[in-house]
């Protein structure tokens, strides 16, 4: 032991009841290495085995100091602290009033986010119970030096173990006057607020001379600091088993049946508090955490208990010596699910948990005067563009490093992301000045609201030119030039379009649009409809209103490419699908009555057939008999018939219907071109009607033989045909209604049955998969993980043995590598 002391500390420290001395004199620590860690572990192991009692705080100070430095160097230190917590102290040990050992332990113990803080407090707790004279010194250190730091720790406490030992120390140093009383003899000023100190120490759950891990201590922490304690849960029941499948579970019981258990996952370890002595410390890498079908969490040990779990309670370690796993039942199932999710989703090293808030990005003030000044600066930069030199562009930019704590006036300022980026001010196109033509007429369709322009001004984030780099300024000037050039091109295009629109207006007035919706498809002849006066003026007026607008489809498409997205074709496809559905539904109709003759007549047609690629609608047309050309009066009457349906057309006499039987002729496909429909209709003396218009025109003054009965119907229209026997249509409608009801009911019944069977299949499959397959594959995956872990461990061991093979000849080296096996440590 003496040799180990000299290797570790540089001097041979004595463990005797000596007088107080300078505890740090003549000792200088060098770089901590793995060898130092092993030597200290061996030294502490000998102290524990030989049951040595610490009689000098100088030795304890250097042991704690070296252990903390080894931990800070990320060297293996768990076993070192395990042996430190098992050290025993003499009750006659000499303690100075300003003991550096206790001060150092307190300072390290109340540090936040330190994995060994609670272990330093555990050492103080052990000294407090073993050395009676230490209580006065610890109380004085807390009041004078560490009170404020303890208050800050409780405001942000995360470690349940640290809180347990700290509350134990406080409850023994600042006791209640009685177990049932709320008064404390002397309250330390942990916070500046008296009410906060009073609430902490005079709380009904504040323990009376408690021990760490007791029910009072844990309840006090959970009731007051549960929101800050990370990954902490309260358990109702803890069971353990000696089998790997956790069968034949045994329930862990205390003397007091009302006690609860507490668990926390922190610093890549799991701490389970079962009694008042010490927690069970599980190594996260050496256990596997799962959940069974009853939502109970299971902790399975990958290795023997003493290799996976550490505890200073010898009786507890002896009880669980042959344990292979634990089963935990939480008081709150939701809390258990949260704990299970957090334990199995530990943040990786590369995962971002915090971020810095930059406070030097300021929004542009809303004052208009300041905006004008900023615009003036931009214009000055544009004029001085040619005067910039390469030396200015090559000068390094030095940006000040700001504090990560934002100021009050910039609390809500965020960095500009690509989705929220503001466009350059020069990208705002003033189309209002371009919408006026030469005659002063304003295009009605081009209206840009001022709200959009104001929104851009308020959202615009200004960055001062002093903070910009020359490269960024040059790029912004380039973008301004490009946008200005684009605006000039757009203005020229609008001027050219205005000239073309005026020429189109004159042509349209000379050749008015001939509306042919009043043409009626009759039996086999066409006659000139009744003349109506004063139609030319109406047609010219309508044409002027329609042609007055200079906006065409091409102009709208240009604006869509600038400000919006290309028009979707869903609407056209929807109309086509709707027409197809109507066609399919009505062409399958079969009337009940017998019609003498429904054969389609082969009629001639002088109308040219349009190509199918630009098909608009399908109409039923009859052969044109008369060769007369339609006059302007006829065209005028057609326009009138399209706008208003007359009362004479709606009231058709039954006598006329009985004498004249219009035949259902074959429908012909007629297409319409947007640019040439009016000219071709006038030359060929025929009309093209939209499929959505259905009109009937029959002059009541003339006989059926001398008139033209016209029915403009869709290809899917059902004509009310009358048989010679005079059967009526209501019977036919009743039959179709009943047939539709039967079809609907049968389809509805079939769909309901199908949905019910599918739901049954889903439920049964889910149950079968959860019960039978989940446990099977969980076991397979766990075995796979174990095998993979064993193989990797064997590979690491083999890599460590390579250095011993460097002295072998080549043949023996190849033979040794090839014969090496990674199964059960066999070669």
From Swiss-Prot:
Protein name according to UniProt: Protein RED1
A cellular component annotation (GO) from this entry: synaptonemal complex
GO terms assigned for molecular function: chromatin DNA binding; identical protein binding; structural molecule activity
Location(s), subcellular: Nucleus
Top-level division of the source organism's lineage: Eukaryota
Biased composition range(s): Basic and acidic residues: 619-648
InterPro entries: Red1/Rec10
Amino acid composition bias (Basic residues), ranges on this chain: 569-584
UniProt KW keywords: Meiosis, Nucleus, Sporulation
Main location: nucleus
Biased composition (Acidic residues): 364-373, 381-391
Role this protein plays: Probable constituent of the synaptonemal complex during meiosis. May interact with HOP1. Required for meiosis I chromosome segregation.
Disulfide bond residue pairs: none
Species, as recorded: Saccharomyces cerevisiae (strain ATCC 204508 / S288c)
Swiss-Prot/TrEMBL GO biological process terms: homologous chromosome pairing at meiosis; homologous recombination; meiotic recombination checkpoint signaling; reciprocal meiotic recombination; sporulation resulting in formation of a cellular spore; synaptonemal complex assembly
Region feature Disordered, mapped onto this chain: 364-393, 563-655
């Amino acid at each position: 032991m003496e040799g180990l002391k000299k290797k570790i500390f540089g001097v041979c420290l004595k463990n005797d009841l000596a007088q107080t001395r300078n505890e740090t004199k003549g000792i200088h620590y060098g770089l901590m290495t793995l060898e130092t860690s092993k030597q200290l572990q061996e030294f502490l192991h000998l102290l524990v085995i030989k049951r040595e009692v610490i009689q000098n705080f100088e030795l304890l100070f250097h042991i704690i100091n070296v252990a903390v430095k080894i931990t800070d160097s990320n060297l293996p230190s768990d076993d070192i602290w395990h042996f430190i917590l098992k050290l025993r102290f003499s009750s006659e040990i000499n303690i100075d009033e300003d003991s550096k050992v206790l001060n150092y332990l307190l300072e390290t113990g109340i540090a936040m986010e330190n994995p060994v803080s609670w272990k330093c407090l555990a050492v103080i707790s052990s000294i407090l119970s073993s050395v009676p004279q230490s209580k006065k010194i610890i109380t004085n250190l807390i009041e004078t030096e560490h009170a404020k730091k303890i208050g800050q720790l409780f405001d942000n406490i995360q470690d349940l173990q640290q809180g347990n030992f700290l509350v134990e120390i406080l409850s023994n140093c600042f006791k209640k006057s009685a177990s049932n009383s709320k008064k404390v003899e002397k309250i330390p000023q942990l916070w500046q607020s008296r009410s906060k100190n009073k609430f902490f120490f005079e709380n009904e759950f504040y323990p009376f001379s408690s021990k760490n891990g007791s029910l009072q201590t844990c309840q006090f922490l959970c009731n007051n600091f549960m929101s800050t304690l990370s990954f902490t849960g309260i358990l109702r029941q803890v069971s353990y088993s000696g089998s790997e499948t956790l069968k034949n579970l045994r329930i862990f019981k205390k003397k007091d049946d009302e006690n609860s258990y507490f668990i926390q996952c922190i610093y890549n370890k799991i701490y389970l508090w079962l009694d008042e002595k010490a927690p069970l410390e599980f190594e996260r890498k050496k256990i596997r955490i799962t959940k069974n079908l009853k939502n109970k969490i299971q902790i399975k040990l990958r290795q023997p208990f003493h290799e996976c779990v550490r505890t200073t309670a010898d009786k507890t370690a002896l009880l669980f010596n042959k344990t292979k796993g634990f089963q935990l039942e939480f008081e709150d199932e939701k809390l258990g699910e949260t704990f299970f999710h957090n334990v199995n989703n530990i943040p990786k090293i590369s995962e971002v948990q915090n971020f810095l808030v930059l406070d030097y990005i300021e929004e542009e003030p809303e004052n208009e005067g300041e905006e004008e000044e900023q615009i003036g600066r931009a214009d000055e930069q544009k004029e001085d563009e040619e005067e910039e030199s390469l030396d200015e562009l090559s000068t390094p930019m030095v940006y000040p490093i700001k504090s990560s704590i934002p100021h009050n006036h910039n609390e809500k300022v965020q960095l500009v992301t690509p989705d929220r980026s503001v466009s350059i001010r020069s990208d705002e196109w003033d189309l209002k000045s371009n919408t006026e033509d030469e005659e002063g007429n304003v295009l009605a369709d081009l209206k840009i609201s001022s709200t959009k322009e104001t929104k851009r001004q308020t959202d615009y984030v200004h960055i001062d030119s002093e903070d910009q780099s020359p490269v960024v300024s040059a790029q912004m000037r380039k973008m301004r030039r490009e946008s200005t050039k684009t605006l000039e091109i757009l203005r020229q295009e609008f001027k050219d379009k205005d000239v073309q629109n005026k020429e189109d207006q004159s042509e349209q007035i000379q050749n008015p649009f001939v509306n042919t919706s009043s043409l009626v498809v009759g039996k086999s002849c066409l006659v000139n409809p009744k003349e109506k006066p004063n139609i030319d003026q109406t047609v010219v007026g309508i044409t002027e209103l329609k042609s007055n607008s200079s906006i065409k489809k091409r102009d709208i498409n240009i604006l869509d490419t600038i400000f919006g997205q290309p028009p979707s074709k869903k609407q056209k496809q929807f109309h086509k699908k709707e027409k197809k559905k109507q066609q399919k539904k009505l062409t399958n109709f079969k009337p009940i009555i017998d019609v003498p003759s429904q054969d389609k007549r082969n009629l001639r047609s002088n109308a040219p057939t349009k190509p199918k690629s630009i098909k608009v609608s399908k109409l039923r047309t009859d052969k044109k008999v008369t060769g007369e050309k339609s006059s302007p009066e006829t065209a005028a009457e057609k326009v009138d018939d399209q706008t208003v349906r007359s009362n004479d057309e709606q009231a058709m006499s039954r006598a006329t219907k009985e004498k004249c039987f219009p035949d259902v002729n074959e429908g012909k496909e007629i297409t319409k071109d947007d640019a040439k429909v009016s000219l071709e209709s006038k030359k060929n003396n025929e009309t093209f009607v939209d499929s959505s218009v259905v009109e009937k025109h029959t002059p009541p003054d003339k006989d059926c033989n001398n008139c033209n009965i016209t029915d403009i119907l869709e290809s899917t229209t059902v004509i009310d045909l009358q048989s010679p026997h005079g059967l009526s249509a209501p019977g036919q409608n009743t039959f179709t209604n009943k047939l539709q009801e039967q079809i609907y009911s049968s389809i509805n019944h079939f769909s309901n049955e199908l949905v019910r069977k599918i739901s049954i299949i889903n439920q049964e499959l889910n149950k079968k998969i959860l019960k039978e397959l989940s446990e099977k594959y969980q076991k397979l995956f766990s075995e796979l993980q174990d095998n993979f872990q064993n193989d990797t461990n064997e590979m690491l061991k083999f890599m460590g043995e390579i250095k011993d093979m460097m002295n072998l000849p080549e043949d023996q080296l190849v033979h040794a590598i090839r014969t090496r096996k990674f199964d059960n440590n066999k070669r």
